[in-house]
């Protein structure tokens, strides 16, 4: 046999062998099957749900268990604090009070109040009284509680109505990984309502509200600042109906910029009971070490240039 014919035969053999299955193997890729019956809704139905539920709540008072975690990549460590009992008061349009109690003895661990613009924080164990505007940020690793702003909690607890004058809401179909029995993760479809708000510099993403398609209830809310950064990531679980309102009895509020995570487990809840103004008054205790964050911020600003 000539060299040419031997070469051609070898070439044909090398071409045919992979097709015969001798040089490769295949295996099945199993897609985890979601056996849960999924519900459907339109964009307008989800928007109407948000607005209707928000309009039904004017005030709330609750006994809660407070679970707190502080830290992350920025701090280089994560600290889990012992769960404590507390009391939560809310009143529209922006009033909030959160009181935490020490374990066993039930003395106050902290007392925090806000009117939506300014806040006050009393930490009895350190005789420290902090006050300032809600938008003043602090970075005090030795006092992580001072980084917590009541407004973050308020905005996460109560879904705000969508303002048709200044906001646009659109729906997207998405999926999330959920853990089923035996720790198997499956991909489950959900609905996301993106709320875009008109700002001074144009339109910005304000919120993402994620609805589970197993029950068509909001199970997550992402709130963004004007630069597109997530300020709070709230997760809602264990819904119960209270006075015609579906309200989550477990709320986890993560604040990634502050590396502060607080979970509220509701023990007792009352909605739309009268809450007078004096319920949101926090007086400065005598002899307290006062920290005015507004003055601290003013002192940290460089002095304006003057003409010589």
Where do the protein language model's features map onto the residues?
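N-terminal leader/targeting segments and the immediate start of mature chains
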Residues: 22-83, 147, 295-308
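Flexible, processing/modification-adjacent segments and terminal tails
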Residues: 41-44, 123-205, 284
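A mature extracytoplasmic/lumenal domain signature
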Residues: 64-66, 92-94, 100-104, 116, ...
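Gly/Pro-enriched, hydrophobic low-complexity segments
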Residues: 23-24, 169-287, 291
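An acidic-aromatic
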Residues: 24, 93-155, 288
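Sec-dependent bacterial lipoprotein signal peptides
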Residues: 1-22
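Post-signal peptide N-terminal segment of secreted/secretory-pathway proteins
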Residues: 66-110
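Extended lipid/amphipathic-ligand handling interfaces
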Residues: 49, 85-90, 112, 234-241
């Amino acid at each position: 046999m000539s060299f040419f014919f031997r070469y051609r035969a070898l070439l044909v053999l090398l071409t045919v062998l992979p097709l015969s299955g001798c040089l490769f193997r295949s295996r099945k890729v199993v897609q985890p099957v979601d056996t849960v019956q999924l519900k459907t809704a339109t964009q307008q139905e989800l928007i109407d749900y948000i607005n209707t539920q928000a309009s039904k709540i004017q005030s709330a008072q609750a006994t809660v268990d407070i679970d707190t975690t502080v830290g992350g990549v920025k701090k280089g460590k994560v600290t889990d604090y012992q769960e404590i009992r507390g009391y939560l008061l809310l009143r529209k349009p922006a009033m909030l009070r959160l009181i935490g109690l020490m374990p066993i003895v039930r003395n106050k661990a902290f007392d925090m109040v806000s009117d939506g613009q300014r806040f006050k924080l009393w930490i009895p164990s350190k005789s420290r009284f902090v006050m300032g505007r809600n938008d003043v940020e602090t970075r005090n690793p030795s006092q992580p509680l001072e980084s917590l702003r009541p407004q973050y909690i308020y905005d996460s607890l109560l879904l705000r109505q969508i303002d048709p004058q200044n906001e646009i809401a659109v729906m997207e179909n998405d999926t999330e990984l959920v853990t089923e029995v035996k720790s198997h993760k499956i991909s489950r479809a959900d609905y996301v309502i993106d709320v875009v708000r008109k700002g001074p510099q144009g339109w910005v993403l304000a919120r993402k509200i994620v609805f589970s398609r197993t029950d068509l209830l909001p199970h997550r809310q992402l709130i963004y600042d004007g630069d597109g950064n997530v300020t709070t990531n709230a997760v809602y679980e264990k819904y119960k109906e209270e006075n015609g309102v579906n309200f989550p009895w477990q709320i986890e509020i993560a604040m990634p910029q502050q590396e502060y995570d607080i979970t509220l487990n509701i023990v007792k809840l009352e909605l739309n009971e009268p809450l007078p103004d004096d319920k949101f008054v926090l007086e400065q205790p005598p002899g307290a070490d006062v920290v005015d964050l507004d003055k601290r911020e003013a002192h940290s600003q460089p002095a304006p240039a003057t003409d010589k």
